[in-house]
A protein has these predicted regions:
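Core beta-strand elements of the Rossmann-like FAD/NAD(P) dinucleotide-binding domain
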Residues: 19-21, 216-225
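Dinucleotide-binding Rossmann-like beta1-alpha1 core, especially the glycine-rich loop
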Residues: 64-148
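Glycine-rich FAD pyrophosphate-binding loop
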Residues: 40-60
Length: 548
C-alpha cells in the first residue's frame, strides 16, 4: 500500500529542515508575509514561519480599513499621512477587487474641539496629500445626513463631511494569507505552527531551533539573515536571541463588536467617541463592525472586557437612531488585539501614547545580519516589503530578479476571462449572489480551477454554512492548499465565517460538520469538539493559540 501524499504544509516543513536560506522571517502577520513575498519573488531563498497560524495576532483584529491615517493630521504628521495615502493608493491600484474605495460619512457634534469648517479643510488637505486619487470630500448639512443616512441621530449635530479611504471587503487575515500564497508560489518555504525556540549565530549563519507543533518534530533552520517580524511579540523574541535595538514597542488594545448591518448604504459611518477618538461603523458582508477602543496593554494577550463592550455600545447607541438600542445580545462576534506602536527603546519620550502613530521602523544590525520590523499596519505593507528587500541587499543577499513585481491581482484580461467563463457556465444560477466576485477576490487566477470543480460537480457551488458566504469548492481548496491545521484557521482567517455567523448557529450547522469532514477527514469530529471547547486539545496541540 503506497503512502499518502504529503500535504503542502508537510512539504514546506521538510524544506525548512533540509535547505539553507538567505533570509528566515519569523512571524506570519502582514509585515512578515509581505517581506517573504517580496524577497521570494525577487529571487532570495526565503523562509517564513509562525508559532501559530498566519495572521493569528494583530493582523486578524483590524478594522479591515486601508487608510491614509487622517487622524494623524491632528498631530501634524504630514509626511506620514502623505506616505500612507500613497501606500493606500498603490493597494487600490494593485488590488482593485480586494481593496476598494469606501466613503466615510462623518458627523460633527456642536462644541467639538475642532469646528466643522476646520475638519472639512482637513479632509481636503487629506485628499490633496493623497494626490486627488479618490473621490473628493464634501460638506454635509443636517438635511443631507437625514436624507442619506437616516440611521444617524441628529441630536447635537451641526453637520458633517464625507471623504474617501479604502477597506477590505473580505477580511484582513485573508489578505495576509494571499501574500503568503504569493511567497509560496515564488519558492518560499513557509509553514504555520512552527515555533521558534531560539536563534543563535554559528559562524556566518543564524541557526534557529524550531519545533513543528503538529508533529512535535524539532528542526534546525539555517539562514544568512534573520528577520524578526513578530509584531507585538518582537521585543521578547529579540531578548531571547540576545539582540539589542534602539526601538521597542508599547501596546495599545483595540476591540470591535460585530452586529447585524445597521445601514444598507455601503458607507463607513464615522463619529468622534466620548474620548474624542475616531469611531467607525464599517461594512462587513451582512454585518457591521463597530469600534474601536484605545487602551494601554502590558501584554499581547488581551481579551474583550465588559467595560470595552459597554464603551462601544454606549457610544454607538448615542449616535445612531435605531429601532431599539444595541445590547450585548446583538453582538454576533468580537475582535480584540493590540497595536504595536514603535518608540525609542529609552522610553516614549513623555509623549501621550494615544498620539503615537502606526508608523513602522526597520532596524538592522549589519554585523549580526539581523533585522527587526517595528510597528506598521496593513496599509503600509508594500513599503515594508520593498524596504525589507533593500535592507536584505545591504546585508549581502543577492536579489537576481530585483525588478520583479511581487504584489497585485492578475491583469484585467485574466479577470475578464474568469468572469466570461463564470457567465458561460451559469454560476449565478448555481451559487448564491455575488459568488463570482468573491471567488475572484479570494483566489485570483486560481478561481478558474474552482470553476472547473463546479463544472464537474454542481454541488461544489453550494454555500456550506448558511450566511457564511463560502462555497463547498472553497473548503475543498482550503483542504488541498491553504495549510488549515485547526478549524479556527478556516473559520476565522481563510474565511470570515466565524465573524459573520453566530457561534451558536455554527455549532448547530450540519454544514459545519461537512466542512470538518472535508478539511480533516476522520479527525473532523475531534476538531469540531476542540473548537467549541467540548474537549481539551491533545498535548501536541494544547499551545497552538499562544505567541509566535
Amino acid at each position: 500500500m503506497s503512502a499518502l501524499p504529503r500535504s503542502l504544509r508537510e512539504v514546506n516543513v521538510e524544506k525548512l529542515s533540509q535547505e539553507r536560506f538567505d533570509v528566515l522571517v519569523l512571524g506570519g502577520g502582514i509585515n512578515g508575509a509581505s517581506s517573504a513575498a517580496a524577497l521570494a519573488a525577487r529571487g532570495a531563498r526565503a523562509a517564513l514561519v509562525d508559532r501559530s497560524d498566519f495572521a493569528s495576532a494583530t493582523s486578524q483584529e483590524s478594522s479591515n480599513l486601508v487608510w491614509g491615517g487622517i487622524k494623524y493630521l491632528e498631530a501634524y504628521e504630514i509626511g506620514l499621512v502623505r506616505k500612507l495615502c500613497r501606500a493606500r493608493n498603490a493597494l487600490l491600484r494593485s488590488y482593485p477587487s480586494s481593496v476598494r474605495e469606501i466613503r466615510f460619512f462623518t458627523s460633527h457634534t456642536k462644541g467639538f474641539r475642532w469646528p466643522l469648517w476646520m475638519l472639512l479643510v482637513g479632509s481636503w488637505l487629506y485628499w490633496l496629500l493623497g494626490g486627488g486619487f479618490t473621490r473628493r470630500p464634501r460638506l454635509l448639512t443636517l438635511r443631507d445626513i437625514a436624507r442619506e443616512e437616516p440611521v444617524v441621530a441628529l441630536d447635537g449635530l451641526d453637520g458633517g463631511f464625507e471623504y474617501s479611504d479604502a477597506y477590505l471587503p473580505d477580511n484582513d487575515a485573508r489578505f495576509v494569507w494571499n501574500l503568503v500564497r504569493t511567497a509560496l508560489d515564488h519558492g518560499c518555504a513557509a509553514a504555520n505552527y512552527v515555533e521558534s525556540l531560539g536563534s543563535r549565530r554559528e559562524g556566518e549563519e543564524w541557526v534557529t531551533t524550531a519545533r513543528d507543533l503538529v508533529s512535535g518534530r524539532e528542526l534546525s533552520i539555517r539562514s544568512r539573515v534573520l528577520v524578526n517580524a513578530c509584531g507585538p511579540y518582537a521585543d521578547g523574541v529579540n531578548e531571547r536571541a540576545g539582540v539589542s535595538t534602539a526601538h521597542r514597542h508599547v501596546l495599545s488594545k483595540g476591540i470591535h463588536l460585530i452586529v447585524n448591518r445597521v445601514t444598507p448604504s455601503g458607507r463607513a459611518l464615522t463619529f468622534f467617541a466620548d474620548d474624542g477618538r475616531l469611531f467607525f461603523v464599517v461594512p462587513m458582508g451582512s454585518r457591521s463592525c463597530i469600534g474601536t477602543t484605545d487602551t494601554p496593554a502590558d501584554s499581547p494577550e488581551v481579551a474583550v472586557t465588559a467595560e470595552d463592550r459597554r464603551f462601544v455600545l454606549e457610544n454607538i447607541n448615542k449616535r445612531l437612531r435605531l429601532a431599539r438600542p444595541l445590547t450585548e445580545a446583538d453582538v454576533v462576534a468580537e475582535r480584540c488585539g493590540v497595536r504595536p506602536l514603535v518608540v525609542d527603546a529609552a522610553g516614549a519620550g513623555g509623549r501621550d501614547w494615544m498620539q503615537l502613530s502606526r508608523r513602522h521602523v526597520i532596524e538592522s544590525d549589519p554585523v549580526k545580519r539581523h533585522v527587526t520590523i517595528f510597528g506598521g499596519k496593513l496599509t503600509d505593507c508594500l513599503n515594508v516589503g520593498q524596504e525589507l528587500c533593500d535592507e536584505a541587499r545591504r546585508l549581502g543577499v543577492a536579489l537576481p530578479r530585483a525588478d520583479q513585481a511581487w504584489f497585485g491581482e492578475p491583469d484585467a484580461s485574466a479577470r475578464q476571462r474568469f468572469f466570461d467563463e463564470a457567465g458561460r457556465m451559469g454560476l449565478d444560477a448555481l451559487a448564491p449572489p455575488g459568488a463570482a466576485e468573491r471567488l475572484w477576490r479570494r483566489f485570483g487566477a486560481g478561481a478558474l480551477g474552482l470553476l472547473e470543480a463546479i463544472r464537474k460537480d454542481a454541488s461544489a457551488a453550494q454555500e456550506v454554512v448558511e450566511g457564511g458566504a463560502v462555497l463547498r469548492c472553497e473548503v475543498e481548496e482550503a483542504a488541498r492548499g491553504e495549510m488549515v491545521v485547526a478549524l479556527d484557521d478556516f473559520l476565522r482567517r481563510r474565511t470570515a465565517m466565524a465573524q459573520v455567523v453566530r457561534r451558536e448557529d455554527l455549532r448547530g450547522s450540519p454544514g459545519l460538520r461537512e466542512v470538518c469532514r472535508i478539511l480533516f477527514g476522520e479527525g473532523g469530529q475531534a476538531r469540531l469538539a476542540e473548537y467549541f471547547g467540548d474537549v481539551s486539545a491533545p498535548p501536541e496541540r494544547a499551545g497552538w493559540r499562544r505567541a509566535p
